[in-house]
């Protein structure tokens, strides 16, 4: 996924009220939209280098959007709205090898009245649901983690993926790791024990789990390589 314009470098002052971030660009402090309502645990230290996009649409109240934060020499993509675009680009361009060379890809497909999954992929007459989770947490130097806060919605998705397997679908949960410099991924069971337990149940039931790391720079973010999931 390419940015429409090259990003602008700045320094993070603070994030507040979930949706706002003050950023210093040169000698000016601007307020940017923060497109990530999660905890952003470990990313928000004052002085962290950031990259923002700029939109000159006069109808927009905030011209800048926070896109990338640099933490411990690692670039981290924080715009959750881009996760599905990055995943779609990966699916279309056969970057996710487990579902490469597919016949069709549909986005936002309902499984039942209450739940829709990010993608329905068809390959060799097999229907495959793919649910995407954006990953930005890394507390250990080389290991990405999910979730960064308790996620009841995430647990619900795991349970529904189990139901999809029971009905004959193949199911994948793709952890999209928007963090450079990590080699492994694991479930943060100390943050959300229930999610970890549901992960184990889903794995046992036949849900497939994948972790793919992204390549990140000020011009684009795209899926780069598969990394190892190290949970039991």
UniProtKB/Swiss-Prot annotation:
UniProt-listed InterPro entries: SfsA (IPR005224), SfsA_C (IPR040452), SfsA_N (IPR041465)
GO MF terms held by the record: DNA binding
CDD domains: SfsA-like_bacterial (cd22359)
Disulfide bonds: none
NCBIfam families: sfsA
Family per record: Belongs to the SfsA family.
PANTHER family: SUGAR FERMENTATION STIMULATION PROTEIN A
Protein name stated in the entry: Sugar fermentation stimulation protein homolog
Naturally occurring in which organism (per UniProt): Pelagibacter ubique (strain HTCC1062)
Name of the gene: sfsA
């Amino acid at each position: 996924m390419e940015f429409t314009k090259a990003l602008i470098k700045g320094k993070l002052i603070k994030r507040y009220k979930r949706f706002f971030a003050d950023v210093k660009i040169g000698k000016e402090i601007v307020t940017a939209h923060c497109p990530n309502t999660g905890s952003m645990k470990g990313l928000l230290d004052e002085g962290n280098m950031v990259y923002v996009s700029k939109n000159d649409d006069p109808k927009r109240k905030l011209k800048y959007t926070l896109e990338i934060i640099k933490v411990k020499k690692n670039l981290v993509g924080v715009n959750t709205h881009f996760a599905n675009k990055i995943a779609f680009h990966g699916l279309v361009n056969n970057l996710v090898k487990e579902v490469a060379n597919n016949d069709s890809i549909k986005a936002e497909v309902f499984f039942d009245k209450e739940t829709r999954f990010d993608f329905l992929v068809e390959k060799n007459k097999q229907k495959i649901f793919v649910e995407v989770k954006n990953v930005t947490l890394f507390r250990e130097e080389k290991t990405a983690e999910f979730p960064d806060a308790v996620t009841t919605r995430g647990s619900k998705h795991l349970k529904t993926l189990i139901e999809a397997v029971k009905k004959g679908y193949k199911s994948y949960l793709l952890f999209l790791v928007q963090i450079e410099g990590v080699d492994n991924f694991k479930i943060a069971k100390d943050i959300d024990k229930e999610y970890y337990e549901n992960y184990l149940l889903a794995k046992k039931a036949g849900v497939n789990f994948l972790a793919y790391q992204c390549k990140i720079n000020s011009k684009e973010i795209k899926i780069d390589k598969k990394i190892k999931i190290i949970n039991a």
